[in-house]
Amino acid sequence: MKVLQEKILNEGKVLSGDVLKVDAFLNHQIDPVLMQEIGKEFAKRFKEENITKIVTIESSGIAPSVMAALELGVKVIFARKRKSLTLQDNMYVANVYSFTKQETNEISLSRNHIDENDRVLIIDDFLANGQAALGLMSLVEQAGASIAGIGIVIEKAFQDGGKKLREQGVRVESLAEIASLDNGTVTFVQQETAEVK
């Protein structure tokens, strides 16, 4: 997605060979126009999948998920990382290790909002080692719902998360695939199909 790649190049900051900071438009400050375009792109890619619900994880996955849900006409349910006084019982639970925060979180979804009749699109901001996506898949599978695919805003293709998910037969659609963050420079995976001008 060209507009996203341009945003990453112009406003993203490479902090190391593994870490890209995109807090200027995605995971702290949010660019709503960009999120709207991201939502439209996810909806376009998954429009034939009969999605009934989008599942994401708090908090950075919420904005792109809501925009995609608006386009698809479905609801969003986000996995919580912290226990809530109002959501204590009747939960699906999974453990997820965060590479960025170097900690394991117990994530949960209420059983009241997802069931075996749902066809789910999972959306997240980043895909690196795949732990968040695997945790979300576990929650969806515990509910008996089917997974239509996973939409990722930015995939670090040089890490093994995407490979792990695809090897399990999961459809993964990434809007920006990064081949490398070496030497403080973002290098994107070359698309196999050239854009028609």
Swiss-Prot record:
It catalyses: XMP + diphosphate = xanthine + 5-phospho-alpha-D-ribose 1-diphosphate. Belongs to the purine/pyrimidine phosphoribosyltransferase family. Xpt subfamily. Pathway: Purine metabolism; XMP biosynthesis via salvage pathway; XMP from xanthine: step 1/1. GO terms for cellular component: cytoplasm. InterPro entries: PRibTrfase_dom, PRTase-like, Pur/Pyrimidine_PRTase, Xanthine_PRibTrfase. It comes from the Bacteria. It holds the Pfam family Pribosyltran. Its main location: cytoplasm. 5-phospho-alpha-D-ribose 1-diphosphate binds at residues 128-132. Homodimer. Keywords: Cytoplasm, Glycosyltransferase, Purine salvage, Transferase. This is Xanthine phosphoribosyltransferase. Xanthine binds at residues 20, 27, 156. Its EC number is 2.4.2.22. CDD domains: PRTases_typeI. One of its GO terms (biological process) is purine ribonucleoside salvage. Converts the preformed base xanthine, a product of nucleic acid breakdown, to xanthosine 5'-monophosphate (XMP), so it can be reused for RNA or DNA synthesis. It is found in: Cytoplasm. One of its GO terms (molecular function) is xanthine phosphoribosyltransferase activity.
